[in-house]
């Protein structure tokens, strides 16, 4: 017998996508969000073809156009001193029906919230979950003492997930020795419809346009020994960002100098959870597999999770459905997490023979065999979880 009702914990991208995907299959869904409103800080997202496949299957791709999401043309790798191009990877090559887009996080959250509401999802705000208990009928306790039960509880509340700790024990996060700043500035720099990775020794800057090219999203990563807290809501003085990237030149320097407000967070490496489900409780998104930002796949993996979970629940008995979900998702997200963790080292090479050789190899590869460089990511971008199996 199928699952008829569910509680989803967390009003971020993964939670909203899961609520919308489950409700569109006829399930009664309640979404619990601890904040007083479902809002997002100003930041951008890169939605690659694999994530867009999910949004398209949910009938939401046109909403991205309405919100002036930018279709990405390329990823450009460049040197930090003056912005000299090292390599250009064409994102328009071989993408088929699914383009690569840059979207404001708040816009995607609003799109998914609208889809959830159209599916008659009940949204409860200010609902902080204090405890999750798996069982024949799983239940949770809110911080105000009230209890809720459902046939399925989906924990999509991120790295501080209550259910992750219940199913897997204490987290074993490790500080990577890297911190990241986030900021959004006006596009007064003629930034093209491309994602730029400006590479310097021990640091790199990612930039891409948002909202029809009116804004530019910045993510600046620096290697350092000192620890910083996880989560991107920790405000920092833009002067610290400018000091860390003082030797960057060209457009990168101009954009950094334009930052008026930024957040800073420490990058921690988390293992992919070994156990994703137990007694009607299941993990989704960062609650199951937090990933570093160096492959821009956090939101895309959450969208894939949401679709596969909903599809599994629709077509299989409860415990079989959750086991199928984990079996399909765990190997893929493990590969993504490992690939993301390896990218920072490639961006942060110090001056010397290795850096020169690496940059020369990138330049030659993107010039002589660009299709091969782009094709190296086919396993990631051309994976469509919505395709009939």
Locate predicted features:
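Flavin-binding catalytic cores
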Residues: 231-263, 318, 326
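C-terminal helical "tail/cap" subdomain of flavin- and related membrane-associated enzymes
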Residues: 1-4, 66, 82, 295-296, ...
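Residues at the starts of beta-strands that form the adenosine-phosphate
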Residues: 5, 28, 214-218
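Active-site substrate-recognition segment that forms the wall
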Residues: 195-228, 238-240, 245-246, 250
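Short glycine/proline- and charge-enriched loop/turn segments
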Residues: 33-36, 90-96, 223-227, 306, ...
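Conserved N-terminal helical subregion
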Residues: 2-6, 23, 48-184, 225-242, ...
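Short helix-loop capping/hinge motifs at secondary-structure junctions, enriched
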Residues: 62, 83, 187-192, 213, ...
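Conserved mid-domain beta->alpha element of the FAD-binding
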Residues: 11-24, 28, 32-35, 154-155, ...
